[in-house]
């Protein structure tokens, strides 16, 4: 199946990597599974200062499909005073607020939209009330893909202003976030839209793990 495939967490049925996220047999969630290449800590030396330095450990097969806005490799700061207050000698804080859209959501959104590009999808979106909308819209703009943000109709517009500035289309849903999530899932599946935190979720969650890879590397691979 190539570099990676999808596997049902419950019954272990395997699938080609698509924007399928639920098993046809048992309705269990699908996870990305890798045919890991031979890598070690030296593999990642002298690479770009983004989370894409860990390309071999992410679910994109062709580097030409990477959609990057230079997120990742954020500062790891030793919190001396707070650590002393808490009785901890080695307390570190990972500052993902310096990512391009100011949150860790740039990691999963970037991986999901890169996969959407690799799969040939022509539009992406998300159900969000804030940070994810911004991250999805920014990456969609970089990829040249239309972006649809599903959010409650009574949301404070300031929460999605950044997403709108990137050209996102706001779809107002009467009801709660759960209602917006449900509508996003229905429209995404029926229209072939890659909704990053729903039908692209299997790939989306893979981006978050780069946080821990960076922490390990920034500690010279000597984790507490």
List the predicted regions and their residue ranges.
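PLP-dependent amino-acid enzyme catalytic core
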Residues: 1-224
């Amino acid at each position: 199946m190539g570099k990676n495939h999808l596997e049902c967490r419950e019954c272990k049925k395997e699938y080609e990597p698509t924007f399928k996220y639920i098993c046809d047999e048992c309705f269990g969630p699908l996870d990305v599974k890798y045919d890991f290449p031979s890598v070690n800590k030296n593999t990642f030396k002298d690479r770009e200062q983004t989370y894409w330095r860990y390309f071999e450990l992410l679910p994109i097969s062709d580097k030409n499909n990477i959609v990057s806005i230079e997120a990742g490799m954020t500062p790891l700061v030793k919190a001396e005073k707070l650590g002393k207050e808490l009785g901890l000698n080695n307390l570190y804080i990972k500052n993902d607020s310096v990512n391009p859209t100011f949150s860790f959501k740039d990691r999963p959104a970037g991986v999901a939209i890169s996969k959407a590009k690799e799969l040939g999808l022509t539009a992406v979106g998300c159900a969000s009330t804030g940070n994810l909308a911004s991250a999805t819209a920014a990456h969609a703009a970089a990829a040249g893909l239309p972006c649809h943000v599903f959010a409650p109709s009574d949301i404070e517009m300031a929460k999605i202003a950044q997403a709108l500035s990137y050209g996102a289309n706001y779809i107002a849903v009467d009801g709660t976030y759960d209602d917006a999530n449900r509508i996003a899932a229905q429209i995404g599946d029926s229209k072939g839209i890659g909704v990053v935190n729903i039908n692209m979720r299997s790939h989306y969650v893979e981006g978050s793990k780069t946080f821990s890879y960076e922490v390990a590397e920034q500690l010279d691979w000597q984790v507490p």
